[in-house]
């Protein structure tokens, strides 16, 4: 009787403890970060990430690797290279179009010197490269290995940079004072015979081994050598210098020499002008020593300034007078003065 009672108590005790036993088989619901009293080893993860332990099942189950049923619609579609090119091209065209629109609006609102609005032709469109519009969202920095095809040309960048000094704004035109030219008569000459028979000649072989001959129109002077070379000086233009050299050749030909006119060439041109203001030559000489400028007022009252391009030598005086020499073309005289004028203005005496 007592044994049966003990067995019944055991059965009731098992029935009473079964629910609590099942609950103890599950891992704790709270994370180990929120249960400091539990050791870390009790809830350590399995060594193989692809396996999942189920203690209440008493076994190990492989994790599923099939993601075909997962909804990935929230992820953005990856752009291909073609789509990227199309996107960049579209953004570039939109930027250029906005530049054209702003350029037309600014030109329509720009008044001329009389105050009237400019009438622009709507068919004319500005150069796309002249509109410098940059989009921060789509601009890419060019790398040294891969040059950027959208980069601005070097010539365009150079044209946007201001030149200093700026030529062509002084309003002063240097006047030619002397043109030196040479020619070859292609024959040997008897200088004594020329000096005795020609007018307006000088010949002193002890002082200078050439005949000095002068004519009135154009008023020039020629040096005639026994080798047939002629040097003509004093002309005011290239045409006058050539005409004078041919006249000297004609005079020598009339004296019986087989003269032929060859190799006429301009060797030197001298021009002068006045800037109409005094110049501080001492400071100019100190700041432009790299151009071989020399100023010795005890020896010569002017500053000698040797320009590199064009190769022209300038004699600058404190009164504002400028002499330019060493040019072989008229344009070099004008270019050298226009390059020098801003420098002279910066050293103007106040």
Swiss-Prot record:
Stored PANTHER family: TATA-BOX BINDING PROTEIN
Output compositional bias ranges, type Basic and acidic residues: 94-116
Has keyword Transmembrane? no
Q: Entry's InterPro entries? A: TBP, TBP_CS, TBP_dom_sf, TBP_eukaryotic
Specify residue ranges for compositional bias: Polar residues. 118-128, 139-150
Family membership, please give it.
Belongs to the TBP family.
Report the protein's function: Transcription factor required in complex with TAF3 for the differentiation of myoblasts into myocytes. The complex replaces TFIID at specific promoters at an early stage in the differentiation process.
According to the record, the residues making up region (Disordered) are 82-150
Mention one GO molecular function: DNA binding
The UniProt gene name for this protein comes to Tbpl2
Describe the subunit structure.
Interacts with TAF3.
- Does the keyword Transmembrane belong to this entry? no
Q: Which UniProt keywords apply?
A: Cytoplasm, Developmental protein, DNA-binding, Nucleus, Transcription, Transcription regulation
Report the protein name in the record. TATA box-binding protein-like 2
Its primary localisation, in coarse terms, equals cytoplasm
Provide the tissue specificity: Expressed in myotubes and myofibers (at protein level). Expressed in a wide variety of tissues with highest levels in heart, lung, liver, uterus and placenta and especially the gonads. Expression is higher in the ovary than the testis, and within the ovary expression is localized to the oocytes.
Its BP terms in the Gene Ontology are: DNA-templated transcription initiation
The entry's localization annotation reads: Cytoplasm; Nucleus
Which PROSITE patterns did the record assign? Answer: TFIID
Gene Ontology cellular component list: cytoplasm; female germ cell nucleus; nucleus
């Amino acid at each position: 009787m007592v044994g049966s009672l003990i067995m019944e108590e055991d059965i009731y005790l098992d029935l009473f403890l079964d629910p609590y036993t099942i609950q103890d088989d599950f891992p704790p619901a709270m994370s180990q970060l929120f249960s400091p009293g539990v050791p870390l080893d009790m809830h350590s993860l399995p060594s193989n990430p692809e396996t999942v332990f189920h203690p209440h099942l008493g076994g190990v189950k492989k994790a599923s690797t099939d993601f075909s049923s997962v909804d990935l619609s929230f992820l953005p579609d990856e752009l291909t290279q073609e789509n990227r090119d199309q996107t960049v091209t579209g953004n570039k065209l939109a930027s250029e179009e906005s530049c054209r629109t702003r350029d037309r609006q600014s030109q329509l609102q720009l008044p001329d010197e009389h105050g009237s609005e400019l009438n622009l032709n709507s068919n004319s469109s500005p150069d796309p490269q002249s509109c410098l519009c940059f989009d921060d969202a789509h601009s890419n920095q060019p790398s040294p290995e891969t040059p950027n095809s959208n980069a601005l040309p070097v010539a365009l960048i150079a044209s946007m940079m201001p030149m200093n000094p700026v030529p062509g704004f002084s309003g002063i035109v240097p006047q030619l004072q002397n043109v030196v030219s040479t020619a070859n008569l292609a024959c040997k000459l008897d200088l004594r015979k020329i000096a005795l028979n020609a007018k307006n000649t000088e010949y002193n072989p002890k002082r200078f081994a050439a005949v000095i001959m002068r004519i009135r129109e154009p008023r020039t002077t020629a040096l005639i050598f026994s080798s047939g070379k002629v040097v003509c000086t004093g002309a005011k233009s290239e045409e006058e210098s050539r005409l004078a050299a041919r006249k000297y050749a004609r005079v020598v030909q009339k004296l019986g020499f087989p003269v032929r006119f060859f190799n006429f060439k301009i060797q030197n041109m001298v021009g002068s002008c006045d800037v109409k203001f005094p110049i501080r030559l001492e400071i100019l000489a100190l700041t432009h020593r790299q151009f071989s400028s020399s100023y010795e007022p005890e020896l010569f009252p002017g500053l000698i300034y040797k320009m590199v391009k064009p190769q022209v030598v300038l004699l600058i005086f404190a009164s504002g007078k400028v002499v330019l020499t060493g040019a072989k073309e008229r344009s070099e005289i004008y270019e050298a003065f226009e390059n020098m004028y801003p420098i002279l203005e910066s050293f103007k005496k106040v």
